[in-house]
């Protein structure tokens, strides 16, 4: 019963990780298509007036687009999380239906993979959160523009890209990444508990085997008495 509960908890966490990763992959892919391969994360720019003698902001000009690697890394990390979560969810569901428990090596390998994904998704989440905050600070000039970052997606910035949904896309991606990170953190915790439990069982088994060997090697009192009697005769 305890094994089934543990496997069910693992399966639920893998399903959540799969779901949240899917929530990330879709908007990031759409944004890459809308921005024609350009990355808005960490983008630098400013508002310029058509007539420099008039202090009126009219058009946003990009000085330097963000590094494409930032968006690609976040998308690839989400895809990896999606595929691994799907594979492990299917495997755990199979064990749950069969009532089978994996070996100590598979549990340890699962712990290493989960810890790696936690680290990877955390980096991707940080990149998206920090990069998108910098983009919003740039296009709103840290709040001096009379429009919020969310409102500016409804205004054509004339950048040669489709910016009609960038805020929604990255808001959803941020939520999905951090939620996915929490799901993988729970998976890693469960994997660690599994490895620790298996280690304790192995240690207990070794202890029992050792005690059995000592008991078998120790002569019984009757045997000792007969040996002493034979020695006296």
UniProtKB/Swiss-Prot annotation:
It is found in: Membrane. The chain crosses the membrane at residues 6-26, 75-95, 104-124, 170-190. Its main location: membrane. GO terms for cellular component: membrane. Keywords: Glycoprotein, Membrane, Transmembrane, Transmembrane helix. The keyword Transmembrane applies. It is a multi-pass membrane protein. The keyword Transmembrane applies. Coiled coil: none annotated. Glycans are attached at residue 51. Belongs to the TMEM179 family. This is Transmembrane protein 179. It comes from Homo sapiens (Human).
């Amino acid at each position: 019963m305890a094994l089934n509960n543990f496997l069910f908890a693992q399966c639920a966490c893998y399903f959540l990780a799969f779901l949240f990763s899917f929530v990330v992959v879709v908007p990031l892919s759409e944004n890459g298509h809308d921005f024609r391969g350009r990355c808005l994360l960490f983008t630098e720019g400013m508002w310029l007036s058509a007539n420099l003698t008039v202090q009126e902001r009219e058009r946003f000009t990009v000085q330097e687009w963000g590094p494409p690697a930032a968006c690609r890394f976040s998308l690839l990390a989400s895809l990896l999380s999606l595929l691994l979560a799907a594979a492990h969810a299917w495997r755990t569901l199979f064990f749950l239906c069969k009532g089978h428990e994996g070996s100590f090596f598979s549990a340890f390998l699962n712990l290493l993979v989960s810890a790696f994904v936690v680290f990877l998704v955390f980096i991707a989440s940080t990149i998206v959160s920090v990069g998108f905050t910098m983009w919003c600070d740039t296009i709103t000039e840290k709040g001096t523009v009379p429009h919020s970052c969310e409102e500016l997606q409804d205004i054509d910035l004339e950048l040669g890209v489709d910016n009609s949904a960038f805020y929604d896309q990255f808001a959803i991606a941020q939520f999905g990444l951090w939620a996915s990170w929490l799901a993988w953190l729970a998976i890693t915790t469960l994997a660690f508990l599994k490895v620790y439990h298996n280690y304790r069982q192995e240690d207990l088994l070794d202890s029992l085997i050792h005690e059995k060997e000592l008991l078998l090697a120790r002569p019984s009192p009757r045997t000792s008495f007969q040996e002493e009697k034979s020695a006296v005769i």
